[in-house]
Amino acid sequence: MAAPEQPLAISRGCTSSSSLSPPRGDRTLLVRHLPAELTAEEKEDLLKYFGAQSVRVLSDKGRLKHTAFATFPNEKAAIKALTRLHQLKLLGHTLVVEFAKEQDRVHSPCPTSGSEKKKRSDDPVEDDKEKKELGYLTVENGIAPNHGLTFPLNSCLKYMYPPPSSTILANIVNALASVPKFYVQVLHLMNKMNLPTPFGPITARPPMYEDYMPLHAPLPPTSPQPPEEPPLPDEDEELSSEESEYESTDDEDRQRMNKLMELANLQPKRPKTIKQRHVRKKRKIKDMLNTPLCPSHSSLHPVLLPSDVFDQPQPVGNKRIEFHISTDMPAAFKKDLEKEQNCEEKNHDLPATEVDASNIGFGKIFPKPNLDITEEIKEDSDEMPSECISRRELEKGRISREEMETLSVFRSYEPGEPNCRIYVKNLAKHVQEKDLKYIFGRYVDFSSETQRIMFDIRLMKEGRMKGQAFIGLPNEKAAAKALKEANGYVLFGKPMVVQFARSARPKQDPKEGKRKC
């Protein structure tokens, strides 16, 4: 049975194991990196100050420059001086002190003083003690000193432990929990090896050799303790089973050794490299031309045609004039005639131009009554239905001319050419058609069916024309009145800008103009 492997002494700092654990009886120190500013005598005095009996300072050139050998009376004094001198900063230099090796001591023998020789000759007891200590060391470090094997272990021999597995690690953890001294020694070893402390959160599980092992049949369970009196085998069975047992044990040992060697040489798999995403190439122009265009956001809503917004140009030329009179028109004309008759009865005092019935095409034409402006305002306010805004509210809600000049919306304001359609812009987001009907409905006679049909509101809520509206009124007079009164009215915090809508008129050919001239 082999003896357990001896623990290695782990050094701290820059010192080697040989410097901290010298052989017994070693009293000579090798001091390196001595300052060049010091002379040989000063270096000798420095080392003697720390307890050295004899000092040999080497030259300032060569492999061992700025070094010195210091011999101390005993091993304890040498160790004490080493702990004090090692890593000591002196004149900008850091001293490195270690025990002198045997070859260094052979090549550079230290001179011994006469007093030292006398002590050695007078004290033969110390030599006997050292010899006894060396003999004790050989016995202590031998293979089996109880059996007479006092020679040391072969340094080439090494234990071949199986690779770590979950069961082995679980057994080690159980041993740590049951043996407190073992637990403390493991913590000491982790501290010396500069491993992370195990007192924090659980670390990630490293790859185990079990993951790379081929699956094999589990080994048969072994009994923890052999029976006291096992049954004796028969004589006939002994002869036949001896050979098979030897063969099976040899084969099992070989298989186990082969598996252990394979696992020892097996390298863990490398982690799979994550493939980088392919960078998209820039598309060429010819490919972009053939690809179908993505549907724009505006396609989700009905597209307004130019004919829905602007008046269409009329082609120049002779046209046949046709009248398409619907069935509802006679009833509308009857109502208009009844109103005219009522107006005739009221204004019978005013002079009228009488025309012969044979020359009258569509009835009688009467002059406009001359009424004051104040009377018109009263009539308008009285005749307006309750659904529409009053003139006073319009005047209160309008901004002054001075304020219009300061606003950027009214800087380049032009009313445009008069027509029956008006264009309103700078509307707020919350404006709806009913709000515009509430304002511009006061310029429409809702009792007249023709004016009701001609009154049209188109509010643009989306797209490029958002915040604008086109309003069709019965005639140019109503449109001019609406422009004058509603321009600058603040609706939902924003003043409205009212203009006459631009009508697309046909362009004359230059040839026709020249012919006319």
UniProtKB/Swiss-Prot annotation:
<dbReference type="GO" id="GO:0030626">
    <property type="term" value="F:U12 snRNA binding"/>
</dbReference>
<dbReference type="GO" id="GO:0008380">
    <property type="term" value="P:RNA splicing"/>
</dbReference>
<keyword id="KW-0225">Disease variant</keyword>
<feature type="modified residue" description="Phosphoserine">
    <location>
        <position position="21"/>
    </location>
</feature>
<dbReference type="InterPro" id="IPR035979">
    <property type="entry name" value="RBD_domain_sf"/>
</dbReference>
<dbReference type="GO" id="GO:0005634">
    <property type="term" value="C:nucleus"/>
</dbReference>
<keyword id="KW-0539">Nucleus</keyword>
<keyword id="KW-0677">Repeat</keyword>
<feature type="domain" description="RRM 1">
    <location>
        <begin position="27"/>
        <end position="102"/>
    </location>
</feature>
<keyword id="KW-0597">Phosphoprotein</keyword>
<protein>
    <recommendedName>
        <fullName>RNA-binding region-containing protein 3</fullName>
    </recommendedName>
</protein>
<keyword id="KW-0507">mRNA processing</keyword>
<dbReference type="InterPro" id="IPR045164">
    <property type="entry name" value="RBM41/RNPC3"/>
</dbReference>
<comment type="function">
    <text>Participates in pre-mRNA U12-dependent splicing, performed by the minor spliceosome which removes U12-type introns. U12-type introns comprises less than 1% of all non-coding sequences. Binds to the 3'-stem-loop of m(7)G-capped U12 snRNA.</text>
</comment>
<dbReference type="GO" id="GO:0005689">
    <property type="term" value="C:U12-type spliceosomal complex"/>
</dbReference>
<keyword id="KW-0242">Dwarfism</keyword>
<comment type="subunit">
    <text>Component of the U11/U12 snRNPs that are part of the U12-type spliceosome. Found in a complex with m(7)G-capped U12 snRNA. Interacts with PDCD7.</text>
</comment>
<dbReference type="InterPro" id="IPR000504">
    <property type="entry name" value="RRM_dom"/>
</dbReference>
<keyword id="KW-0694">RNA-binding</keyword>
<dbReference type="InterPro" id="IPR012677">
    <property type="entry name" value="Nucleotide-bd_a/b_plait_sf"/>
</dbReference>
<keyword id="KW-0747">Spliceosome</keyword>
<feature type="compositionally biased region" description="Basic and acidic residues">
    <location>
        <begin position="115"/>
        <end position="130"/>
    </location>
</feature>
<dbReference type="GO" id="GO:0097157">
    <property type="term" value="F:pre-mRNA intronic binding"/>
</dbReference>
<keyword id="KW-0508">mRNA splicing</keyword>
<feature type="region of interest" description="Necessary for interaction with PDCD7">
    <location>
        <begin position="1"/>
        <end position="257"/>
    </location>
</feature>
<dbReference type="GO" id="GO:0000398">
    <property type="term" value="P:mRNA splicing, via spliceosome"/>
</dbReference>
<feature type="modified residue" description="Phosphoserine">
    <location>
        <position position="108"/>
    </location>
</feature>
<dbReference type="GO" id="GO:0005654">
    <property type="term" value="C:nucleoplasm"/>
</dbReference>
<feature type="domain" description="RRM 2">
    <location>
        <begin position="420"/>
        <end position="503"/>
    </location>
</feature>
<feature type="region of interest" description="Disordered">
    <location>
        <begin position="213"/>
        <end position="254"/>
    </location>
</feature>
<feature type="region of interest" description="Disordered">
    <location>
        <begin position="106"/>
        <end position="130"/>
    </location>
</feature>
<dbReference type="InterPro" id="IPR034147">
    <property type="entry name" value="RBM40_RRM1"/>
</dbReference>
<feature type="compositionally biased region" description="Pro residues">
    <location>
        <begin position="217"/>
        <end position="230"/>
    </location>
</feature>
<feature type="region of interest" description="Disordered">
    <location>
        <begin position="1"/>
        <end position="26"/>
    </location>
</feature>
<feature type="compositionally biased region" description="Acidic residues">
    <location>
        <begin position="231"/>
        <end position="252"/>
    </location>
</feature>
<dbReference type="Pfam" id="PF00076">
    <property type="entry name" value="RRM_1"/>
</dbReference>
<feature type="region of interest" description="Necessary for binding to m(7)G-capped U12 snRNA">
    <location>
        <begin position="211"/>
        <end position="380"/>
    </location>
</feature>
